[in-house]
From Swiss-Prot:
Species, as recorded: Methanosarcina barkeri
Residues reported to bind [4Fe-4S] cluster: 97, 132
Subunit and partners: Homodimer.
CDD domains found in the cross-reference section: NifH
Biological process, per Gene Ontology: nitrogen fixation
Name this protein carries in UniProt: Nitrogenase iron protein 1
Entries under SUPFAM superfamilies matching the protein: P-loop containing nucleoside triphosphate hydrolases (SSF52540)
Family: Belongs to the NifH/BchL/ChlL family.
HAMAP family listed in its UniProt record: NifH (MF_00533)
Enzyme nomenclature, EC number: 1.18.6.1
Record's comment on post-translational modification: The reversible ADP-ribosylation of Arg-100 inactivates the nitrogenase reductase and regulates nitrogenase activity.
Pfam families given in the database record: Fer4_NifH
Coiled coil residues, start to end: none
Length: 275
């Protein structure tokens, strides 16, 4: 049975980098068949898996060529180790609703049978915070069953993660979606591991994995590759291998208990991350 996963996190946290490296690790080390559906109007959720190729998005195809042109051949590309990739895209800057584009794109993929039964995982890589109904769609309508939140020990990253949990709490009963855990993409801030463990525990979930910071991630990106493709024997690639294994074996799925703003600020203050 295909597992449908949504990756959420604050913009700039490294969510798409983490998601793509995890997908690459699942395929390369664990032999899994992966489909990545990018749900970010920047359309950068699949770039590393595709070797830097700028993918034609579903919304661009709809705008320029019409719905009949949205075919698997036109919008789905295959990247590293057979990973299939599609990008929702978004409206022209300043016009329309990007969240609406996510809804349209997912519906079109379902109608054309793109989420085939032979897939082991579908990754929905979703823009930052749950800022509107469109970006909440993967969790609101049960498109994804599991959510992993990419965060760090910085205040705004934990604030965004907490907001995402509020969205999860709102939709969990109707859609069946559950939180699988927090993935810390380390920024090397003081007491980061300890704070993220406490934050995850307060939410009623687990710190699924702590991804250390390593410059090879940037080197791989300069070469338009995931770390797993760039150097599959390096330490960081093996970290992603272990993260993928944690997701594969995860059996802790919860409805989160979001913190109040006061609770969140007090926790951050305790760890000395605020002036």
């Amino acid at each position: 049975m295909t597992r449908k996963i949504a990756f959420y996190g604050k913009g700039g946290i490294g969510k798409s980098t983490t998601q793509q490296n995890t997908a690459a690790a699942m395929a390369y080390y664990h032999g899994k068949k992966i489909f990545i559906h990018g749900c970010d109007p920047k359309a950068d959720c699949t770039r590393l898996v595709l070797g830097g190729v700028a993918q034609t998005t579903i919304m661009d195809t709809l705008r320029e060529l019409g719905e009949d042109a949205v075919t698997a051949e036109n919008v789905i590309n295959t990247g590293f180790d057979g990973i299939k990739c599609v990008e929702s895209g978004g409206p022209e800057p300043g016009v329309g609703c990007a969240g609406r584009g996510v809804i349209t794109a997912i519906n079109l993929m379902e109608e054309m049978g793109a989420y085939s039964e032979d897939l082991d995982f579908i990754h929905f890589d979703v823009l930052g915070d749950v800022v509107c109904g469109g970006f909440a769609m993967p969790i609101r309508e049960g498109k994804a069953q599991e959510v992993y939140i990419v965060a760090s020990g910085e205040m705004m990253a934990t604030y965004a993660a907490n907001n995402i949990c509020k969205g999860l709490l709102k939709y969990a009963e109707q859609s069946g979606v559950r939180l699988g855990g927090i993935i810390c993409n380390s920024r090397r801030v003081d007491n980061e591991l300890e704070m993220m463990e406490e934050f995850a525990s307060a939410l009623g979930t687990q710190l699924l994995y702590f991804v250390p910071r390593d410059n090879i991630v940037q080197k791989a990106e300069f070469n338009k590759k995931t770390v797993v493709e760039y150097d599959p024997t390096c330490n960081q690639a093996l970290e992603y291998k272990e993260l993928a294994k944690k997701i594969l074996e995860n059996d802790m799925f919860v409805i989160p208990k979001p913190l109040s703003m006061d609770q969140l600020e007090k926790m951050v203050e305790r760890y000395g991350l605020m002036d």
